UniProtKB/Swiss-Prot annotation:
One of its GO terms (biological process) is glutamine catabolic process. The active site is at C84 (nucleophile), H176 (charge relay system), E178 (charge relay system). CDD domains: GATase1_PB (cd01749). Its EC number is 4.3.3.6, 3.5.1.2. Keywords: Glutamine amidotransferase, Hydrolase, Lyase, Pyridoxal phosphate. L-glutamine binds at G52, E53, S54, R111, I139, R140. It comes from Pasteurella multocida (strain Pm70). This is Pyridoxal 5'-phosphate synthase subunit PdxT. In the presence of PdxS, forms a dodecamer of heterodimers. Only shows activity in the heterodimer. GO terms for molecular function: glutaminase activity; pyridoxal 5'-phosphate synthase (glutamine hydrolysing) activity.
Length: 193
């Protein structure tokens, strides 16, 4: 396995699947920190925006001054990886919702696109560049409804909808790779940092 010990990756720890992301980062050999204050962002090589409740995370990001600080992290070219709610936070537009959180990625996201909590599922997903399928866990998952194909690279689709996409230093994922033992999506992110 490649050496990632030189990387310091933070996971925004306002709400959501923080410990699961930290575990995967550490399993890959990188340094991992739960980020609770804006000042902790400066030492990072990359940041994960975890799944959780996007409205709650967005409100807390505004309350604690994270919006502009994370936008600055992105402008510096540092990697940002949004999973599920994190994808919603990264989007420049939400379908049928005027709310914009970070507005960094040229995508329009539909929230809860695959149904409610009771409709959660796991599927074998083909991801560009992966030799075998990935065990993707979808929980109240969004999908990308519209994408600027000139700026955004679509890495995976499910039922005709984009569920994993990359734009320069940004990675957006509709499913929860942190809830599996498969480290390849997180490793892909570390390669971006």
């Amino acid at each position: 396995m490649k050496d990632y010990s030189h990387l310091h990756i933070g996971v925004l720890a306002l709400q959501g699947a923080v410990s699961e992301h930290l575990r995967q980062i550490e399993q890959l050999g990188a340094n991992a920190s739960a980020i609770k204050t804006v000042s902790e962002l400066t030492a990072l090589d990359g940041l994960v925006l975890p799944g959780g409740e996007s409205t709650t995370i967005g409100r807390l990001m505004r309350q604690y001054g994270f919006i502009e600080a994370i936008q600055d992290v992105a402008k510096q070219g540092k990697g940002i990886f949004g999973t599920c709610a994190g994808m919603i936070l990264l989007a420049k537009q939400l379908e049928n919702d005027p709310t914009v959180h970070l507005g960094l990625m040229d995508i329009c996201v539909q929230r809860n696109a695959f149904g409610r909590q009771v409709d959660s599922f796991q599927t074998a997903l083909e991801i560009e560049g992966f030799a075998t399928t990935f065990p993707a866990v979808f929980i109240r998952a969004p999908h990308i409804a519209q994408v600027n194909h000139e700026k955004v690279q679509c890495l995976a689709t499910f039922q005709g909808h984009v569920v994993l996409a990359k734009q320069q230093n940004l990675l957006a994922c509709a499913f929860h790779p942190e809830l599996t033992t498969d480290l390849r999506v997180m490793q892909h992110f570390l390669e971006m940092c």
